[in-house]
Amino acid sequence: MAQEEKERIVIPDENGDEHLFDELFKFTVDETGKSYILLTPVGEEEGEEEEAEVFAFRFEDREGEENDIALFPIETDEEWDMVEEMLNTFSEE
């Protein structure tokens, strides 16, 4: 069975160095209309004893820019709890 091609995102750090991430999944919360994305660093494979590092962001599509999104930090405990619940559900599948 062929492995599904993952979306990749480049995120620059505070020094301007670019880091490549694989998209784990995206979801939108109907009640708030906010969208979230979960990413893992490229090249970091999940081992038997070690879990892959997962980064979560709120995102918005940039108007007029195809395949371009703006990432925002998750700021509230309620958002973190919801993202964690979604990740746990995704991990169980």
Swiss-Prot record:
Top-level taxon: Bacteria
Pfam families with a match to the protein in the record: DUF1292
NCBIfam families with a match to the protein in the record: PRK13678.1-4 (NF010217), PRK13678.2-5 (NF010222)
Family: Belongs to the UPF0473 family.
Protein name per Swiss-Prot or TrEMBL: UPF0473 protein BH1270
Organism whose genome encodes this protein: Halalkalibacterium halodurans (strain ATCC BAA-125 / DSM 18197 / FERM 7344 / JCM 9153 / C-125) (Bacillus halodurans)
